[in-house]
């Protein structure tokens, strides 16, 4: 709930609201539609944030402060109106103002589409960090692409995922402030010409194709301060339309350039199962990087008039490898546009960039074919080649001319450019996103690089914009916490630790259980309205919501459900604690096996739904089109948080933190941030199962043969055979074969441990006071996972912001 103090902004809003309705729509507040109210209210908030941002950045520049630029292909922003109103502490005032006109603020929120400019945790993390940077008062700007459609809308047709365009701009454009005067020309293809002049070697890029990048700014509010971040989103278009060619009848040729340019900012992550898709993704990456770096350099020059101090005033952060081409692009500007020597340019670059790695899986480390890069961005390719040549030469000299080690560390090998290796070579800091992940990076993924430059490697455990997931999304829990420990936790997540002293207070525990029940009832109403599915709120809400990928092991969850289902079919009258398994996930459009797993979850849910003897005890629900808004409704209602990736595969996770914050108990492996969640809440308040990372590596080294487990474990055998025989009339041979014959993420090896953990967590749940105590300790321990804490660590230890 919002604070009760008077907010000086409210007088201005009360005055502007009816005026803007009259000016834009010629209606009074009483006559206005909810959609008109949404647009006017949003525009007022944008104006407030814009003024705060200008004041904030003017102060930074006048003080000579350093700024961070956060480059990411994804920013999963969700809705802005509610978050901005809460962060500006205007919720009570605006709600009361609208009530005078008989307008319901909660209904107004529903008119805003999710800004789905991301796919999952990577994009949501970036969004949380812009919030955290604004809250903590660090000057920051994010850079990404203004995707016309963003991530797809998911629709299940007979359980099969289909992808529909996510047309977010009509409702979301009110949050975008166009800056056409800051447009930048981006050059693709073309030829390189080399020449010498007065003993200087010059390279000129000619005969290129131009795409114009136009920026749109989205303001990101922080809580309770003067800071405002900006997310600068770049839209692509052709520089002009060739009317002469069109009038001569060459329609296809005249339109082709427009089509190629427009495709760049059309959708997030186009399918890259074919060459055209790969080419488009590469164009997207360079487009974003060239626009961002060009804009950063221009802005810096406007303030300081020189690039000599760029690294002292600018930190550029690469969030995963998609923005890697920003490194050679800054080199290009320094060399070609500004005339720096290679050595001086490289010194500036290597003091400016920092890199966060988000994966330890070799297949997920981004690589690009050299011929594709050479064709699409020839000047950038030539710079990468020179970076690699000089880097390898320095490695040879440093490592006693160990050619094998140099080959392993080379940026270019096997006709591929290894983007993560380029990031490590060019960045002054390389960090993982959990303690385990950062250790794995040093031990295996970048072991040679770590030995070469150990001082570069750091850890910053992920954090979340916790106010969004608690203060904004869970008012009932916020009210209880405020009454129990005071309201300081809304500003400072560390204050949540004060709840720990109430772990044996039956009155507080009883109230906590009542809050959870209330939230489950509210979520059930939401699901009924959205999907016409009726949830049993007296059951355990067991939740696995995240991107659909084999390493996240949704199919391990499914295996256990199949085992429970088989047991209940044979023992329909047996005692069984009712449980509702809730899934929500999107699969990449070209990821066939992931789509099969989604269909299998749907098939199980349908078969159980049709069985009246079982469906009161066991329920499976797949919620379509997982997004930030759905997550905000679900997190407060969750009992069990499934974090079941194979140890050593999940970098960190952030859904685990949001669920923990709302009192869900983690059922998980010792992977990613689960280890730190365990440390924060206490061993007795989390349920851990499965192999550790060393045990996984040992089993791989010995030789893992899943078919042996299949042949010798009756429950596993039956579950996989059920996939072959059919569920709700559908067979899942590909999923079954993958588990039985390959099982790359060791589902079968961890199954017995997982099933025992499921039984134990059910026993804990049935002891109501014990469960409430476990829940309370999770909430009390969640403060460490605040984005405010994470960005402060980045600012102090990596970006060196004041």
Can you annotate each of these PLM segments?
Residues 1-802:
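A conserved ligand/cofactor-binding region detector
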């Amino acid at each position: 709930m919002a604070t009760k103090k008077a907010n000086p902004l409210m007088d201005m809003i009360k005055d502007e609201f009816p005026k803007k309705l009259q000016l834009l729509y010629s209606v009074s507040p009483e006559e206005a539609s909810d959609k008109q109210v949404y647009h006017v209210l949003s525009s007022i908030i944008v104006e407030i944030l814009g003024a705060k941002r200008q004041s904030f950045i003017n102060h930074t520049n006048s003080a000579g402060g350093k700024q961070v630029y956060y480059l990411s292909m994804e920013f999963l922003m969700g809705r802005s109106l509610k978050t901005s109103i809460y962060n500006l502490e205007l919720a009570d005032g605006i709600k009361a103002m609208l009530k005078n006109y008989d307008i319901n603020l909660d209904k107004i929120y529903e008119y805003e589409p999710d800004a789905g400019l991301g796919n999952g945790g990577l994009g949501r993390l970036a969004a949380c960090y812009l919030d955290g940077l604004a809250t903590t008062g660090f000057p920051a700007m994010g850079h990404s692409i203004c995707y016309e459609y963003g991530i797809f809308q998911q629709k299940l047709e007979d359980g099969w995922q289909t992808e529909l365009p996510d047309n977010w701009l009509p409702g979301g454009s009110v949050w975008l402030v166009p800056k056409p005067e800051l447009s930048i020309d981006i050059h693709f293809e073309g030829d390189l010409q080399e020449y010498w002049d007065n003993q200087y070697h010059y390279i000129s890029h000619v005969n290129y194709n131009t795409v114009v990048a136009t920026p749109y700014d989205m303001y990101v509010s922080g809580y309770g301060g003067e800071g405002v971040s900006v997310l600068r989103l770049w839209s692509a278009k052709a520089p002009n339309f060739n009317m002469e060619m069109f009038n001569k009848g060459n329609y296809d040729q005249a339109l082709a350039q427009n089509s190629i340019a427009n495709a760049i900012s059309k959708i997030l992550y186009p399918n890259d199962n074919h060459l055209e898709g790969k080419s488009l993704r590469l164009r997207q990456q360079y487009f974003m990087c060239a626009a961002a770096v060009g804009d950063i350099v221009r802005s810096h020059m406007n303030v300081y008039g020189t690039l000599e101090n760029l690294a002292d005033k600018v930190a550029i952060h690469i969030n995963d490898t998609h923005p890697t081409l920003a490194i050679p692009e800054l080199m290009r500007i320094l060399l070609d546009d500004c005339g720096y020597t290679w050595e001086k340019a490289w010194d500036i670059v290597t003091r400016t960039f920092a890199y966060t790695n988000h994966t330890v899986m070799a297949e997920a480390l981004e690589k690009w074919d050299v011929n594709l890069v050479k064709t699409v961005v020839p000047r950038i390719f030539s710079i990468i080649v020179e970076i690699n040549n000089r880097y390898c030469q320095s490695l040879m000299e440093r490592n006693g001319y160990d050619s094998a080690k140099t080959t392993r560390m080379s940026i270019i090998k096997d006709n591929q450019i290894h983007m993560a290796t380029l990031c490590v070579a060019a960045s002054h800091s390389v960090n993982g996103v959990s303690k385990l992940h950062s250790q794995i990076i040093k031990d295996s993924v970048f072991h040679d690089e770590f030995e070469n430059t150990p001082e570069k490697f750091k850890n910053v455990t992920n954090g979340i914009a916790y106010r969004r997931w608690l203060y904004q999304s869970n008012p009932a829990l916020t009210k209880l916490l405020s009454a129990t420990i005071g309201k300081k936790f809304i500003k400072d997540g560390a204050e949540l630790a004060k709840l720990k002293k109430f772990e044996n207070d039956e009155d507080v525990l009883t109230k906590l259980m009542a809050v959870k029940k209330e939230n489950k009832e509210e979520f059930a109403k939401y699901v009924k309205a959205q999907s016409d599915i009726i949830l049993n709120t007296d059951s355990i809400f067991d939740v696995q919501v995240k991107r659909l990928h084999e390493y996240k092991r949704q199919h391990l969850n499914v295996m256990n459900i199949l085992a429970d289902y088989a047991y209940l079919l044979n023992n329909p009258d047996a005692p069984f604690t009712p449980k509702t398994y809730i899934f929500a996930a999107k699969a990449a459009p070209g990821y066939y096996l992931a789509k099969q797993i989604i269909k299998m979850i749907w098939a199980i849910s349908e078969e159980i739904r049709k069985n009246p003897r079982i469906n009161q005890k066991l329920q499976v629900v797949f919620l379509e089109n997982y997004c930030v808004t759905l997550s905000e409704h679900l997190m407060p209602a969750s009992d069990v948080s499934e974090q079941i990736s194979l140890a050593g595969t999940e970098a960190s996770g952030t859904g685990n933190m949001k669920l923990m914050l709302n009192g869900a108990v983690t059922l998980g492996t010792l992977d990613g941030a689960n280890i730190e969640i365990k440390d924060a809440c206490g061993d007795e308040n989390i349920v851990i199962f499965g192999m550790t990372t060393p045990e996984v590596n040992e089993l791989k080294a010995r030789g893992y043969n899943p078919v042996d487990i299949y042949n010798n474990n009756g429950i596993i055998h039956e579950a996989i055979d059920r996939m072959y025989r059919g569920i709700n009339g559908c067979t899942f041979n590909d999923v079954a074969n993958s588990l039985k014959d390959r099982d790359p993420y060791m589902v079968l090896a961890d199954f017995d441990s997982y099933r025992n953990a499921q039984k134990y967590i059910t026993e804990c749940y049935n002891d109501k006071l014990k469960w409430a105590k476990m829940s309370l300790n999770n909430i009390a321990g969640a403060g460490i996972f605040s984005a405010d804490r994470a960005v402060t660590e980045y600012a102090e230890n990596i970006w060196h912001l004041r």
